[in-house]
């Protein structure tokens, strides 16, 4: 999971279906419990105590997280790397796209970042579809997969 030290805290944000909220006490345990084989396949082992920028909620149900960070040597000035994960029961419903779009709106309004990036494994079809749906453009390949970017 990523952290964004020195970044403005995300305020509660919603599109009427998906809501992003800052993590609360107890959320980290629920985020760890929500991991499955896909989590480990695409994201690796993950943090023991995850602290994302925001938790993703649908109604009263915690369904995943979104995050971003700026601490990669391959990022250009003004760029951030975005990450996300939804629990299995929340997939294939459009929630990930909605959550990432809300995060991009936060980045646009509350930070000086101008470009969001995604690094996606070539075999991660759902994330490749999300990148296309949200207007990310492939900028090439990196060791971990394909590299996408879009303005925020």
Outline where the language-model segments fall:
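Acyl-donor (CoA/ACP) binding surface of acyl/acetyltransferases
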Residues: 1-38, 53-152
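A short, aromatic/hydrophobic, helix- or strand-capping loop or linear motif
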Residues: 41-50, 57
């Amino acid at each position: 999971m990523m952290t964004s030290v020195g970044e403005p805290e995300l305020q509660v944000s919603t599109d009427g279906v998906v809501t992003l909220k800052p993590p609360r006490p107890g959320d980290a345990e629920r985020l760890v419990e929500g991991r499955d084989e896909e989590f480990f396949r695409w994201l690796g082992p993950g943090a023991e105590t995850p602290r994302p920028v925001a938790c993703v909620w649908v109604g009263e149900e915690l369904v995943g997280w979104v995050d971003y960070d700026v601490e990669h040597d391959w990022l250009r000035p003004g760029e951030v790397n975005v990450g996300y994960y939804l629990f299995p029961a929340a997939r294939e419903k459009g929630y990930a796209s909605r959550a990432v779009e809300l995060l991009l709106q936060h980045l646009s309004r509350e930070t000086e970042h101008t470009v969001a990036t995604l690094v996606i494994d070539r075999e991660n079809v759902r994330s490749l579809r999300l990148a296309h749906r949200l207007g990310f453009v492939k900028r090439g390949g990196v060791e971990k997969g394909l590299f996408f970017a879009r303005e925020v």
